Swiss-Prot record:
Coiled-coil segments on the chain, per record: 14-63
Broad class of the protein's primary localization: cytoplasm
Gene Ontology biological process: attachment of spindle microtubules to kinetochore; cell division; microtubule cytoskeleton organization; mitotic metaphase chromosome alignment
Protein's recorded name: Echinoderm microtubule-associated protein-like 4
Subunit structure: Homotrimer; self-association is mediated by the N-terminal coiled coil.
Location within or outside the cell: Cytoplasm, Cytoskeleton; Cytoplasm, Cytoskeleton, Spindle; Cytoplasm; Cytoplasm, Cytoskeleton, Microtubule organizing center
Function per UniProt: Essential for the formation and stability of microtubules (MTs). Required for the organization of the mitotic spindle and for the proper attachment of kinetochores to MTs. Promotes the recruitment of NUDC to the mitotic spindle for mitotic progression.
Gene: eml4
Protein family membership: Belongs to the WD repeat EMAP family.
InterPro entries found in the cross-reference section: Beta-prop_EML-like_2nd, Beta-prop_EML_1st, HELP, Quinoprotein_ADH-like_sf, WD40/YVTN_repeat-like_dom_sf, WD40_repeat_dom_sf, WD40_rpt, WD_repeat_EMAP
Positions with biased composition (Basic and acidic residues): 116-132
Stretches the record annotates as Disordered: 85-132, 815-927
Ranges annotated as biased composition (Acidic residues): 914-927
Length: 927
């Protein structure tokens, strides 16, 4: 006996030693990888310091050679030389990649020399600014960081000329000269404050169906609940109203409805703030009536994101099961009301697509995914796995979805179009003959249901079953004995089926891969309730005098939307992806630029093709009509601005000229009121001015243009707007900017999922702004409607269109309009005034808790974990205090959570591109 114990101890000791050695080897490998990364960062830093030193030497040499009180034209020429080359000398063309410009739509461009990645590059060799930031946080490089800090601070300073004629800001160490207008007598007296106007999310166009599943449900309130970007939308299709839950900080990926049909759980992916720090994935449980957050679950527990989740049914929804997107796809069970994790276990390294509690057996949880279905026995804090036995049946590539029959059997749909019925049986144990092992699930029956995959199963209230097919696009209704009764095919233009849910009466809802939500019956067919773009979205234009907006995207669709009834007026598919657009001043036609250099003119009412032209073979980045509509400027990635004469109300075009002089691709441009001049920006941070009647000549003395009152202001670089740039920006953080027609505010779209509202003009660095979260990807464009009543913003990868209402905050305790600060909950009662020139009625509304006020860049720092957890525990009294109500009505509650994070999509949790919708989806399941 002692010998047996000794041998057992030896084996345990040997196993322990082996485990320690494995762990040591893993640690050594990790240390080596970190050392390699530090080496790369040091090399990048050395290159940055070298470039800064060369630039400083060149500038110093020029200043010594030229008297400071020389002629203005000479000083201006030197300033332009510095801007384009970083030092003295003649202007030389440079590649767009020289400034590491993030160009998310360049995948369609054919040019190699200016191609760039779809996401912002984090390569340490290119992103020198990021390399410096990382090294400043590394203790092992403390000596180097002091030098970097000094150099960085020097180039972030704003320099004013001794004569007060111009001001310089620095972007990635490069000077940008902006001349001060004559009406600014003393720049030191210029003040930039928060604007009194604020934004409130009014409508969201679009639905995320392309790469998600089982994410459409009908609530007892009559609302369809679904998500897109970081917004969960509650849409009442009968009343044409929307409410929004805005508690999430990044992409929402999954949703589960509590058995009471009131409470909802939604899970999101991990995020990254603008400083590169991770924001943790989590699940939020919230009330669909009040839109208040009940719990925030899983902070610090989940990795990468939340893949799927489900409420328990046998115990009336006390528990919540969650599977994350880590390599092990961890299954956790929570008492969500107590926010306590009860059990946790690894599931599999393969993809997991669904998790469900058994509706009658409280101790059983079922998960399925790639080539597996697992039945988990849950008792206390333990989970035991039993694998489903396929036996004589062919094992499918994927088990896609789950449902439960009235007798307790488990129904699963697979990628081969088969419905499998799993029954609990008694199986003889091979270890002990005659013994019984209870609770083993085996296939008792299989039914051929669809051609292609069975993508979704929906158990109806009357016991009937709805199934949705992938390849065949069919919705089939099955009776209690699983015999098919009715079927209907979703038209091809809507894509394949992603979700099916029971609707009112005999209606049902269908979510599709082309981002449609359809409402239909087997007798009457389908009606479109929600639709949106299916690929990255950049092009946006608002009608000059109607409540219409036009969008174009990489999906080749051009869509005209009505901003009043929130409907689609028309859509047209182009031959190429669209990137930019502008309405003719008459509103009769719209010009659309594409990725190949071609541009189209469409009739704004009939969508007929009016004209087609080609300028170069690279992406067109901006289309802009002159004020009188007689000229059209086309900005291209080939560094040129093409000018066209326009006649017959925008129906006839002839080449007028070409502006040549930019050293990088055109990003933005604006016209003067007299149609004589153009101001343009480029990827090399240039601000150039052009005299159009004189043959599109470059104006060398840019001070001549300092007093032009530009008709529009969309250029992101200029004296009136340079204060919008955040500290430490690399010049690519702002994708779009627009000034309101009343010239009071500036709206801005940035790379950190935020929409900002600044005061205009914004001529002081680090200007404060109101900032808003709803997008979950870089915000690509913004535009005010014709009467400044609304702001439209578009998301890139999230493919969403957000419509915000402008509201002016008016304090009853003061005579003037005062912009609220982040501590506005302690201020006097505030009312909201909708900014509509023709309807100045004051409407009391609940205060938007999701509104973020950016006082300093420090406020954009991510809060600690406990701060985000506390966010869920804050009562809705904040709204009550400001609105003067004891409890908000359902239609008045915003349900918007305060959030100071500035986040962008993590590299490992990007919105994936689904395969072609006409392709069979069986081998590429969507989690």
């Amino acid at each position: 006996m002692d010998g047996f114990a000794g041998s057992l101890d030896d084996s345990v000791s040997a196993a322990s030693t082996s485990d320690v050695q494995d762990r040591l080897s893993a640690l050594e490998l990790r240390v080596q990888q970190q050392e390699d990364e530090i080496t790369v960062l040091k090399a990048a830093l050395a290159d940055v310091l070298r470039r800064l030193a060369i630039s400083e030497d060149q500038v110093a040499t020029v200043r010594k050679a030229v008297p400071s009180k020389g002629p203005a034209t000479l000083r201006e020429a030197l300033s332009m030389s510095c801007i384009t080359n970083g030092g003295a000398g003649t202007r030389k063309p440079s590649h767009a990649s020289s400034v590491a410009k993030k160009d998310t739509l360049s995948s369609a461009a054919k040019s190699v020399k200016r191609s760039s990645t779809l996401e912002k590059s984090h390569n340490s060799w290119d992103a020198s600014e990021e390399s410096r930031n990382k090294l400043m946080r590394a203790a092992s490089t403390s000596k180097l960081t002091s030098k970097v800090s000094k150099a960085t601070d020097k180039h972030k300073d704003i320099v004013i000329s001794p004569e007060g004629e111009y001001i310089k800001m620095f972007m990635r160490g490069r000077p940008i000269t902006m001349f001060i207008p004559s009406d600014v007598e003393n720049y030191d007296d210029v003040r930039t404050e928060l604007p009194p106007e604020k934004l409130k999310l009014e409508w969201v166009f679009g639905y995320r169906g392309r790469d998600c599943r089982a994410n459409v449900y009908l609530l007892p309130t009559g609302e369809i609940v679904y998500f897109i970007a970081s917004v969960v939308v509650l849409f009442n299709y009968e009343e044409r109203t929307q409410r929004h839950y805005l508690g999430h900080t990044d992409c929402v990926k999954c949703i589960a409805v509590h058995p009471d049909k009131i409470r909802i759980a939604t899970g999101q992916i991990a995020g990254v703030d603008k400083d590169g720090r991770p924001l943790q994935p989590h699940v939020r449980v919230w009330d669909s009536v009040s839109l208040s957050t009940l719990q925030v679950i899983g902070l610090g527990t989940f990795e990468r994101g939340v893949g799927c989740l489900a409420f328990s049914k046998a115990d009336s929804g006390v528990h919540l099961s969650v599977i994350d997107d880590s390599n092990e796809h961890m299954l956790t069970v929570w008492d969500w009301q107590k926010k306590s994790k009860i059990a946790e276990i690894k599931t599999t390294n393969e993809v997991v697509l669904a998790v469900e509690f058994h509706p009658t057996d409280a101790g059983t949880i079922v998960t399925c995914g790639k080539s597996h279905i697992f039945f988990w026995t849950w008792s206390g804090n333990s989970l035991a796995r039993k694998q489903g036995i396929f036996g004589k049946y062919e094992k499918p590539k994927f088990v896609q979805c789950l449902a439960f029959l009235a007798n307790g059997d488990v129904l699963a749909g697979d990628s081969g179009g088969i419905m499998l019925i799993w029954s609990k049986t008694n199986v003889e144990s091979t270890a002990s003959k005659g013994a019984k092992v209870l609770g083993v699930y085996q296939i008792s029956k299989q039914i051929k249901a669809h051609d292609g995959s069975v993508f979704t199963l929906c158990q109806m209230r009357n016991g009937m079953l709805l199934t949705g097919g992938g390849k065949d696009r069919k919705v089939i209704m099955w009776d209690h004995d699983l015999n098919p009764e009715r079927e209907i095919e979703v038209p091809d233009q809507y894509g394949t089926i992603r979700a099916v849910a029971e609707g009112k009466g005999d209606q049902f809802l269908v979510g599709t891969s082309r981002n449609f939500i359809l409402r239909g019956t087997f007798n009457d067919g389908f009606q479109v309730e929600v639709q949106g773009h299916t690929d990255e979205l950049w092009g946006l234009a608002t009608h000059p005098f109607k409540d219409l907006l036009l969008t174009c995207a990489q999906d080749k669709q051009v869509c005209l939307w009505n901003s009043v009834d929130h409907s689609l007026e028309w859509t047209r598919v182009l031959d190429e992806p669209g990137h930019c657009a502008d309405f003719h001043p008459t509103g009769t036609v719209v010009a659309i630029g594409t990725h190949s250099g071609r541009w189209f003119v469409l009739d704004a009412e009939t969508r007929d093709l009016v004209s087609i032209h080609t300028d170069g073979n690279e992406q067109l980045s901006v289309m802009r009509y002159s004020v009188d509509g007689a000229l059209l400027a086309v900005g291209s990635h080939d560094n040129f601005i093409y000018l066209y004469n326009v006649s017959e109300n925008g129906r006839k075009y002839s080449r007028y000229g070409k502006c040549t002089g930019h050293s990088s691709y055109i990003t933005h441009l604006d016209w003067s009121p007299d149609n004589q001049y153009i101001m343009s920006n480029s990827g090399d941070y240039e601000i150039l001015y052009w005299d159009i009647p004189s043959g599109c000549k470059l104006i060398r003395n840019r001070s001549e243009c300092k007093d032009i009152n530009w008709t529009t202001y969309t250029c992101v670089l200029g004296f009136q707007v340079f204060g919008v740039w955040p500290e430490g920006s690399d010049g690519t953080d702002i994708n779009a900017l627009v000034r309101s027609h009343n010239r009071k505010v500036i709206a801005l779209a940035d790379d950190f999922c935020k929409v900002h509202l600044f005061q205009y003009p914004c001529s002081k660095p680090k200007a404060p702004s109101h900032k808003y979260s709803a997008h979950s990807s870089h915000v690509t464009n913004v535009s005010f409607t014709h009467n400044d009543g609304h702001l439209i913003s578009t998301g890139g990868k999230d493919m969403s269109i957000m419509q915000w209402r402008l509201i002016e905050k008016v304090s009853h305790s003061q005579n003037d309009n005062i912009a609220e600060s982040s501590s506005a909950v302690n201020s006097p009662v505030v009312s909201e005034k909708v900014l509509q020139p023709d309807t100045p009625t004051t409407l009391p509304q609940a205060v938007n808790k999701a509104t973020e006020v950016e006082q300093t860049p420090a406020e954009s720092m991510a809060p600690p974990e406990d701060a985000l957890e506390l966010e869920a525990q804050q009562p809705q009294d904040l709204d009550d205090v400001q609105s003067g109500k004891s409890s908000p009505l359902p239609e008045e509650a915003n349900g918007q959570e305060p959030s100071d994070e500035v986040i962008e999509e993590p590299a490992n949790s990007q919105i994936v591109d689904a395969q072609d919708e006409n392709q069979d989806d069986d081998d590429a399941p969507l989690s």
